[in-house]
């Protein structure tokens, strides 16, 4: 049996011919080159992959693709690109940003979820083709997910929050800003399964009422950051329940919540000593 060396099998090392070996390849062992490549960004890795056959294998090794941010290429990223990346990276990938990638939809993200089950941080901010089907896939395959950004994914509904609650119990940060189909029922389902939430961004979720905040206050004692900007139906009553249940709160944004009065300041002072 050929032993693995940092995810690259010995047989793959043996494929390098003498004619393919530059001086640096002869001086440095393949294991060290692989380690060096692990510090490079996506663009540099792709350039290295074109240098030689040896570097192609090393640069494209899945262990080098644990953190990928494709925002700079958002106009060029289509579903097939995400599928190919997920197949190459597999279980190595921990963090992926597809922010602003309008061409990525549910089918590609299902393939991604199936292949990248160790994903911990995922940004789909502005991926407007994303629907509840994507959250169902994440729930089914990505139980290690900790941070999820679904801001401006306006097709997201309560069904997504229910799915995340059932399959992503480690979730600590969720951004569903401008997902204006979400109601108190979705929040109720979410917090019952994701009680470890530390940051929740609900900016522009205009259907949320005080009852949604009561669920958060009752089930999210670890909450540190809460953004309720322009949640127009929120009143003092709802925010007071947050103050009483979320004593670790450090950041609260209620800008544009016109039904809030000075009474909330007293509740914050008494119950949230860490507020900045």
From Swiss-Prot:
One of its GO terms (cellular component) is synapse. Gene3D superfamilies: Ribonuclease Inhibitor. LRR repeats lie at residues 74-100, 101-126, 127-152, 153-178, 179-204, 205-230, 231-256, 257-276. Keywords: Cytoplasm, Leucine-rich repeat, Repeat, Ubl conjugation pathway. Widely expressed, with highest expression in skeletal muscle, heart and brain. The keyword Signal does not apply. Signal peptide: none annotated. The keyword Repeat applies. It is found in: Cytoplasm. Residues 22-68 form the F-box domain. One of its GO terms (biological process) is behavioral fear response. It holds the Pfam family LRR_6. Interacts with SKP1 and CUL1. Substrate-recognition component of the SCF (SKP1-CUL1-F-box protein)-type E3 ubiquitin ligase complex. Role in neural transmission. This is F-box/LRR-repeat protein 20.
């Amino acid at each position: 049996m050929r032993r693995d060396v940092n995810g690259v099998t010995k047989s793959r090392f043996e494929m390098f011919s003498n004619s393919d070996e530059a001086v640096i390849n002869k001086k440095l062992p393949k294991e060290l080159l692989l380690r060096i490549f692990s510090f490079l960004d996506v663009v540099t890795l792709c350039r290295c992959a074109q240098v030689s056959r040896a570097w192609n294998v090393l640069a494209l090794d899945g262990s080098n693709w644990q953190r990928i941010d494709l925002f700079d290429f958002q106009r060029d990223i289509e579903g097939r690109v995400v599928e190919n990346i997920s197949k190459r990276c597999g279980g190595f990938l921990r963090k992926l940003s597809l922010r602003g990638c309008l061409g990525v939809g549910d089918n590609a993200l299902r393939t991604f979820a199936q292949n990248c089950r160790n994903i911990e941080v995922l940004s789909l901010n502005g991926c407007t083709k994303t629907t509840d089907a994507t959250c169902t896939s994440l729930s089914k395959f990505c139980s290690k997910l900790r941070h999820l950004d679904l801001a401006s994914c306006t097709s997201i509904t309560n069904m997504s929050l229910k799915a995340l609650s059932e399959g992503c119990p480690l979730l600590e940060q969720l951004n569903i800003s401008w997902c204006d189909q979400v109601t108190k029922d979705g929040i109720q389902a979410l917090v019952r399964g994701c009680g470890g939430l530390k940051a929740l961004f609900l900016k522009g979720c205009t259907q949320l009422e005080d009852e949604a905040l009561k669920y958060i206050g009752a089930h999210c004692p670890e909450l540190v950051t809460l953004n309720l900007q322009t949640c127009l139906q929120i009143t003092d009553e709802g925010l007071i329940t947050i103050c009483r249940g979320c004593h670790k709160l450090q950041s609260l944004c209620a800008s544009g919540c016109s039904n809030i009065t000075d009474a909330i300041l007293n509740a914050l002072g008494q119950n949230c000593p860490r507020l900045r």
